[in-house]
From Swiss-Prot:
InterPro entries assigned to the protein according to its UniProt record, in alphabetical order: ATPase_NBD, Gcp-like_dom, KAE1/TsaD, Peptidase_M22_CS, TsaD
Cellular component aspect of the GO annotation: cytoplasm
The protein's name: tRNA N6-adenosine threonylcarbamoyltransferase
SUPFAM superfamilies reported for this sequence: Actin-like ATPase domain
Location of the protein in the cell: Cytoplasm
Organism: Aquifex aeolicus (strain VF5)
Length: 335
């Protein structure tokens, strides 16, 4: 079977074609980072406008590069939730238009579910497993019992980890998106400043990054000659330590020794290095997708959509996007 997938939940316009036997047949992503960079973050109205401007040219490019026409597609997968509502509207409307015009079934996908199954595009993971989802909008831990069966273990109480990266980068005058910039700059850091690690009582699987962000702001005000490289290094080491400790506690609590780490922040080189070393030291299976699959893309939506379609899930043409349906609830609704 083949699906065409649509992803417009934030600031990437992405389309892909995936075949459950042949694999990836087409994949196109257009980032809006340059558009949002002057503002230090994503501006929802601008994001929606760029999606509207770009989705048809990207669609044409996808069909040309894949040499596939819509008659060869079995169904349309699309991101229904969560995301910026104005951005979601563009992708959902486009998916619905294709489904109506070409009489194709419409299959809804949860954005976080897509991230979880991005690793399956490279290697299947045995159930059950733990999923750490880390991005600009999410920092969550889930127990994945099977496809569509998700137990929420903990999440951020304030900023998402990717959001914290962007805000610290803005404090340092580094530009947007902050994650890749801090990752590169941290490699040149030498001095490790002690920074707070909130909610670190053993067994607490929730996250908090606002205090860490405030501590860096205070440090910058207090020490005038502080090196940006050292701040980036200190911030990143602290963040990676928090994420690893929480993951280890989740393993201890559940007894599960398989960990999937996904989302845009999973592309971070230091995080990959530390988690890989920890997997060898503590004896757990670690799965992190290739960096090209870590950030938002339509291939992950295609894979998850394929799994949903095989289970008989189809949405009506009057389905509307939702800004934030919890993953565990989505798994129960769309089964």
């Amino acid at each position: 079977m083949r699906t065409l997938a649509v992803e417009t939940s934030c600031d990437e316009t992405a389309l892909a074609i995936y075949d459950d036997q042949k694999g990836v047949l087409g994949n196109v992503i257009l980032s809006q980072a340059v558009v949002h960079s002057p503002f230090g973050g994503v501006v929802p109205e601008l994001s929606a406008r760029e999606h509207t401007r770009n989705i048809l040219p990207i669609f044409d490019r996808l069909l040309k590069e894949s040499r596939i026409n819509l008659e060869e597609i079995d169904f349309i997968s699309f991101t229904l939730t969560p995301g910026l509502i104005l951005s979601l509207v563009v992708g959902v409307a486009f998916a619905k238009a294709l489904a109506y015009e070409y009489r194709k079934p419409l299959v809804p996908v949860h954005h976080l579910e897509g991230h979880i199954y991005s690793v399956f595009l490279e290697k299947k993971v045995e159930y059950p497993f733990l999923a750490l989802i880390i991005s600009g909008g999410h920092t969550d831990l889930y127990l994945v019992r099977d496809f569509g069966r998700y137990d929420f273990l903990g999440g951020t109480l304030d900023d998402a980890v990717g959001e914290a990266y962007d805000k610290v980068a803005k404090m340092l005058g580094l530009g947007y998106p902050g994650g890749p910039i801090i990752d590169r700059l941290a490699k040149e850091g030498k001095k490790l400043y002690p920074l707070p690690k909130p909610l670190m009582e053993e067994g607490n699987l929730n996250f908090s990054f606002s205090g860490l962000k405030t501590a860096i702001l205070n440090l910058l005000k207090k020490e005038k000659n502080v090196r940006k490289e050292d701040i980036a290094y200190s911030f990143q080491e602290t963040v990676v330590e928090i994420l690893l400790e929480k993951s280890l506690w989740a393993m201890k609590k559940t007894g599960i020794k398989r960990l999937v780490v996904v989302g845009g922040v999973s592309a971070n080189s230091r995080l990959r290095e530390v988690f890989k070393k920890a997997s060898q030291e503590y004896g757990f299976e670690l799965y992190i997708p290739h960096p090209s699959l870590s950030t938002d893309n339509a291939l992950m939506i295609a894979y998850a959509g394929m799994e949903r379609f095989k289970r008989g899930v189809v949405a009506p043409l009057d389905v509307n996007p939702q800004p934030n349906i919890p993953l565990e609830e989505f798994g129960r609704i769309w089964t």
